[in-house]
Amino acid sequence: LGFYAQDEWNLGNSLKLTYGIRFDNLMFDNDDLQRNDAIYELDFDGQHIDTGKWPDSRWQISPRIGFVWDVFKDKSLKVRGGTGVFTGRLPLVFFTNMPTNASMVQNSVTFKTQYDNGKVVGHDSRLDQLAGGMITDMNQIIDKFNLPTTIEKHVAGSKISGVAQDFKMPQVWKSSIAVDYQVPVSFPLTVTGEFMFTKNVNAVTINNINIKNPDEWKYNKLTTVKGADGKDVTTTELLHTGMQRFNGADNRMVYSYSLYDNPDKNVKYAGDFVHYNGKNAVVLDNTSKGYGYTANITVNAQPVDDLMLMLAYTHTESKEVSGLPGSDPISTWQGLNTIDGSNYVDAQRSQYVVPDKVIASVGYYIPFRHKGLLRGTHLNLFYSGYSSGGYSFCYTNDMNGDGINNDLMYIPKDDSEINFKTEEDRVAFWKFVEQDSYLKNHKGQYAEAYAARAPWVHRFDFRLLEDFEFKIGKTKHCFQLSFDIMNVGNLINSKWGISKSNTVSNSNRILKYEGVKSATDLTPGFSMYKVNGEYPTKTYDTYQNYSECWKLQVGIRYVFN
């Protein structure tokens, strides 16, 4: 439910103010929900998840104001801008995950007949209940199979999803300023500069409340031997209390660890002692972390009749805790690239941002003023240049022991900050680092999520459009015939207009964590990952996909009078 009010105020002939306020409220109905008591009884350090209740409905207020100032009152220089709060809505599939993961609203039942070499070897007699006509009434299906319609015993599933009771829909504070300047020359020439800053007010984040406070973490040595009866007997020896960190330059948090060299296979170190229980319990919540800005400059010109020129450059930065990469809260939480785990993420570069982009276009119109069907020809060439993707340098496996393979890599500044399994690994690693601009320029730092950019791709699109006009009686008919060649440069040269892929470097996962030196010396060791049995020597290679090739599109359009 939303309400909006807006007004304009002209201050003289040169300044116009526009101001307004919006009220939004997303309301919920709890009647169709039922609490799973088995989930609610789980204690996560005093927190409980109520799967039978949506967040509290609340009004969100979004005031805003904008202005346009005609500086010289002749439209040659305009300054415009504004500031305000804007409310959006996240994909509500993240809400519906709460009841669907509550083990209360759905159940899978499989009836099947088994065959072997065309012969029936197993038949579920319940299938006989389906003999006859098609059944579309759910109540008939329930009656035929005597399916339960009430929940007799609540059971907590392995995946639990919740929504914070005070959850708010996403809100951002946006501020912008722009200048439009008509350059005093003999032909139309306009230069526009724009800047917009965005700060998160209520962004969306997901936390796993099943992870204990780090001060409560325990690390154990587990030894398993055969007992007198031949059964395995495991003894536990406490090694550490309180969260541990790796030794050395890469001193990230340790959830669980293994030894670099552990010939005694019946000994395991640091089992899972950082969770309250065996359930993943993720909760949708809010955070104010994150911001973004965009700066743009655009030039438009018409130096001669029927010739239009445009050139624009845009620089964008965006930092966020989570871009919600998925539709399932568990996989979304696990999908974050992190250093210390998905619960300990600061604002990092958005995986969807394109930091720099250049576009340009040339358009020319050739009119035909003689009698005939053809009335004009439009020629257009459009250019776009940008980095085709942002990537993260991560380890190939789970270094910090949180059970998720999303650990951002530490980029050592020299040999003193990293231990390799072999000399060949060391040589191959440094050779790879020196050929990669991101790694080479960020030594001694943790790799930032999605901060490594693929090489720029330059693409041109060409359009030829013909205007046709004729009369039937007194009625004039117009239609257009167009020919579009997308990525026309690739038609000229098969190497042009092709983006780069990082599959040649195992998607930027070049180091494998091999474990720590000992139970008391948590210094990590690494090996260089091999792709198809060979050390990678370059980060990017040609992306071979039909989507990179040139395309021809022919269109026809009728223009109604």
Residue ranges and their predicted role:
Residues F3, Y19-N25, G81-V85, G193-F197, ...:
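Transmembrane beta-barrel strands of outer-membrane/channel proteins
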Residues F3-W9, I65-W69, I177-Y181, I297-A301, ...:
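Residues on the lipid-exposed face of transmembrane beta-strands in outer-membrane beta-barrel proteins
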Residues L11-S14, S57, V71-L77, P184-P188, ...:
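Short loop/turn motifs that connect adjacent beta-strands in outer-membrane beta-barrel proteins
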Residues D24-F28, D74, G84-L90, S186, ...:
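Structural signature of outer-membrane beta-barrel domains
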Residues D31-S62, G66-V283, P455:
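Solvent-exposed loop/turn elements at secondary-structure boundaries
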Residues F145-P148, A270, K371, G376-G473, ...:
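Extracytoplasmic gating/loop element in the C-terminal half of outer-membrane beta-barrel translocons
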Residues E194-L374, H378-S388:
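Gram-negative outer-membrane beta-barrel transporters
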Residues S547-N561:
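Outer-membrane beta-barrel "beta-signal"
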